[in-house]
């Protein structure tokens, strides 16, 4: 069932005015003014909104660090829409290859998919920064063509011990 909600004003403006930035529960506190700036990454993109949280694996990176990495190797970016499920604890009990996580959306551009596929074809290594990125790349791998597929997609995979990596 779909519910449509209409607002008298721009939803992004409304969220900025009355919303509160979600931060990881392990910080053990409410969001602070400083978090709006600090809890961003060098990969933040105001043109592609949609994340409920920053991909925390890259919080320590700054522009200078990223430039050094780009001088040493090829870098491609994908768009991650980190979902609210990232704040949920794992369910108690057995975790196995059938376990599914919360679903998160991502977008891989054609140029990023081409770079990744060329790297794989030439027996190069693909390094993922963070588990959300890793889940996206592994989910985007097509078993038939053995290529990473570009475009908007989503993932709910849970990578656990014994997982056979196809991209990274």
Which role fits each region the language model picked out?
Residues 1-168:
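Surface-exposed, charge/polar-rich loops and edge strands
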């Amino acid at each position: 069932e779909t519910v449509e909600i209409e607002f008298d004003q721009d939803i992004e403006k409304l969220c900025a005015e009355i919303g509160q930035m979600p931060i990881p529960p392990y910080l053990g506190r409410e969001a602070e003014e400083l978090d709006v700036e600090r809890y961003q990454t060098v990969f933040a993109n105001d043109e592609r909104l949609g994340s409920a949280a920053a991909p925390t694996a890259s919080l320590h990176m700054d522009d200078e660090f990223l430039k050094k990495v780009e001088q040493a190797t090829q870098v491609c970016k994908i768009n991650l829409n980190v979902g609210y499920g990232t704040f949920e604890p794992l369910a108690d009990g057995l975790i196995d290859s059938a376990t599914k996580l919360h679903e998160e959306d991502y977008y891989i551009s054609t140029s990023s998919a081409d770079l990744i596929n060329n790297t794989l074809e030439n027996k190069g290594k693909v390094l993922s920064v963070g588990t959300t990125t890793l889940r996206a790349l592994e989910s985007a791998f097509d078993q038939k063509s053995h290529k990473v597929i570009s475009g908007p997609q989503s993932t709910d995979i849970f990578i656990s011990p014994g997982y056979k990596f196809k991209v990274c």
